Design a protein with these regions (language model features):
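Catalytic cysteine-centered active-site loop
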Residues: 88-139
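Aromatic- and glycine-rich peptidoglycan recognition patches
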Residues: 116, 124-134, 149, 153-196
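Intrinsically disordered, low-complexity
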Residues: 1-89, 184-196
Length: 196
């Protein structure tokens, strides 16, 4: 005498920082990135926010690239573009200056926008898959990591800039020393993208 239905739902558990990319369009993500990086120009309203320490009180780590590395025209082009985004906040799924970036969105954007490599938008695993493994990394190569969050395969990627340093989209985009125990424990490989 009645109709009944079975509804099967699969839920995916992910960090709250991933929510904006699922519920916002590109214009909204752009505004969200600006808001989060400036705390709406009202950091006094967010005294306990982690963003105060990340973006306002502690600017990204500066690092001077040795001049001899910049004699490589390809690397100089790459790093000139990449440094434009120092301090941009991490936004899961972000892949442009308008939305800000996640790690693979940042690397894909820099490679493609410079015209050095037409990767399109790839994830960290996709960037690894198109790169040639190298044992002696040079500035402009990519550095890959596993286990930085709960996913299979490559979970993080950065641009190797020489002297055991990388430029990557952590939170915010900044230079980072690869000799720390964290990065050493998650290191997977170096790779050279298919430069034009």
């Amino acid at each position: 005498p009645y109709t009944w239905y079975i509804c099967t739902v699969t839920l995916e558990n992910f960090d709250l920082s991933h929510v904006p990319v699922y519920i916002m369009g590109e214009d909204q993500l752009s505004m969200y990135a600006v808001y989060m990086s400036t705390l709406g120009n009202r950091p006094d309203l967010f005294p306990s926010s982690g963003y105060v320490g990340k973006y306002i009180e502690n600017p990204p780590t500066a690092w001077d690239i040795p001049a001899e590395y910049l004699t490589d025209e390809r690397f100089a082009t790459l790093i000139t573009e990449a440094e434009k985004y120092l301090g941009y906040p991490y936004v899961w799924g972000g892949s442009s200056p308008e939305t800000s970036f996640d790690c693979s969105g940042f690397v894909s954007y820099v490679l493609t926008s410079t015209g050095l490599c037409n990767t399109g938008r790839l994830g960290a695993q996709g960037l690894y898959n198109i790169s040639t493994p190298v044992s002696d990394p040079q500035p402009g190569d990519l550095v890959f990591f596993v286990g930085t969050y709960d996913t299979s395969g490559i979970s993080h990627v950065g641009i190797y800039v020489g002297d055991n340093m990388m430029l990557h989209c952590g939170d915010p985009i900044s230079y980072t020393n690869l000799n720390t125990s964290y990065w050493q424990s998650h290191f997977y490989a170096y790779g050279r993208p298919p430069y034009n």
